């Protein structure tokens, strides 16, 4: 059926001349004989043709993307026959982003999916919202990994172990997963082996992180001048006799930022397949230091992952009979140990970053013994903190309220959060015939977590 196309774009190749078809599919454009017209329209293949008078152009449908196979929750189908709203992210897409976590990998790769970072901590979880906020109390989507619902997020997965991610965005997913799918469904399929020789891969990557910018703050001289001016304007005497003697003083941001914070990843996997067995084994380690406190071992994220995907074909008689002709069983096992150390984040009062922006640049990170002796009331406590060189950390004093020396804060042991997660999925597939398949599966999802904290003496 040949029908007019409204809004198709026509351009003269190599020039700025262009036109758009009207409601009847007609167009007119200034072009010379021998030039080439380029016609584009969404859903149709691009057409290039030589210029002629009274041309009649016909576009053909672009079926290339319609042949892609997508997971829909109850099997796999071609995009050309799927009516639900599905976005797909392939392993090649993930390889181009090198994400820390799987949920971070969806940023900018799936339409209708909003991914925002909850904080700047290393390995921090992201908020994933599919087509907006679903409910007041819980807007997180349902995660399905290899057909098994997973609780508590999917940060236990190594992004390199993933074959594809499908995002089910409309109400059709509710017919499969019920009310749990009210906020959308994210289907994750992990990798398997391919027939041929055994493949062993090792990947290593190392990168650096730096703060995007430093806040523009006063140096010590500018600070002293401003303080004197404020006191004079208030009718009081200035407190600094020679503001210019302080020089630049201390930029506390330079003191606490961990420039060139490292990001490291090791991954090794082995895969293969025969007529009977399909297997994929992997081991991965990831470590990321924080740009604040990472050099004090106070802010970092580590993840150790192990995975084993195995499928065994018990019998395959598809050539001999049409009913009950194939039986296969599969075992997917995964383990992850995640640990992270963090500092106070998004806190105006008392956090290392908040203190670094608030403290006077006249103060120094440490004090000499003579200075400490001269202020015995301030430095006479038995709980004083010292740096690695044995120098006493400066105490800002009572005028700074909850602000503390950020270097002293970072020198203390921090909180260490850790978790162990075991996920096992056992399945069996029987081909009944006539396109019907019977599948039975059993899964176990075990998580153990805890935290080691430290409270300093006062």
Describe the role of every protein-language-model region.
Residues 1-329, 423:
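Short, small/polar-rich motifs associated with maturation and membrane association
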């Amino acid at each position: 059926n040949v029908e007019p196309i409204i809004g198709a774009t026509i351009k003269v190749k190599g020039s700025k001349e262009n036109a758009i078809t009207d409601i009847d599919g007609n167009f007119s454009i200034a072009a010379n004989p021998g030039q080439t017209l380029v016609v584009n329209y969404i859903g149709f293949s691009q057409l290039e043709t030589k210029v002629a008078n009274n041309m009649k152009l016909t576009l053909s449908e672009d079926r290339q993307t319609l042949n892609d196979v997508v997971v829909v929750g109850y099997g796999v189908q071609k995009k050309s026959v799927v009516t639900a709203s599905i976005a797909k992210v392939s392993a090649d897409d993930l390889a181009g982003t090198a994400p820390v976590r799987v949920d971070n990998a969806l940023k900018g790769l799936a339409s209708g999916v909003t991914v925002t970072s909850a904080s700047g901590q290393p390995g921090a979880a992201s908020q994933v919202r599919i087509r907006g906020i679903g409910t007041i109390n819980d807007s997180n989507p349902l995660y399905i990994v290899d057909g098994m619902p997973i609780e508590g997020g999917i940060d236990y997965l190594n992004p390199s172990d993933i074959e594809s991610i499908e995002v089910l965005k409309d109400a059709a997913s509710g017919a499969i997963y019920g009310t749990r799918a009210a906020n959308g469904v994210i289907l994750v399929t992990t990798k398997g082996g391919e027939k041929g020789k055994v493949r062993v891969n090792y990947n290593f990557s190392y990168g650096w992180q730096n703060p995007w910018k430093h806040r523009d703050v006063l140096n010590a001289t500018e600070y002293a001048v401003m303080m004197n001016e404020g006191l004079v304007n208030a009718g009081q005497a200035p407190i600094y006799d020679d503001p210019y003697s302080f020089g630049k003083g201390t930029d506390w941001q330079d003191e606490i930022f961990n420039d060139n914070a490292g990001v490291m990843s090791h991954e090794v996997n082995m895969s293969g397949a025969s007529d009977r067995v399909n297997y994929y084994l992997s081991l991965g380690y990831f470590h990321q230091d924080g740009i604040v406190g990472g050099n004090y071992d106070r802010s970092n994220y580590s993840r150790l992952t192990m995975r084993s995907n195995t499928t065994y074909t018990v019998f395959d008689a598809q050539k001999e009979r049409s009913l009950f002709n194939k039986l296969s069983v599969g075992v997917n096992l995964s383990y992850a140990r995640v640990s992270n150390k963090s500092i106070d984040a998004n806190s105006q009062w008392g956090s290392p970053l908040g203190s670094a922006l608030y403290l006077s640049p006249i103060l120094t990170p440490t004090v000499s013994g003579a200075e400490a002796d001269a202020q015995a009331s301030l430095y006479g406590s038995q709980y004083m903190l010292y740096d690695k060189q044995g120098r006493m950390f400066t105490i800002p004093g009572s005028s700074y309220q909850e602000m503390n020396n950020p270097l002293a804060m970072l020198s203390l042991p921090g909180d260490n959060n850790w978790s162990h997660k075991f996920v096992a999925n056992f399945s069996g597939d029987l081909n009944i015939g006539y396109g019907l398949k019977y599948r039975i599966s059993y899964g176990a999802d075990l998580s153990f977590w805890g935290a080691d904290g430290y409270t300093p003496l006062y």
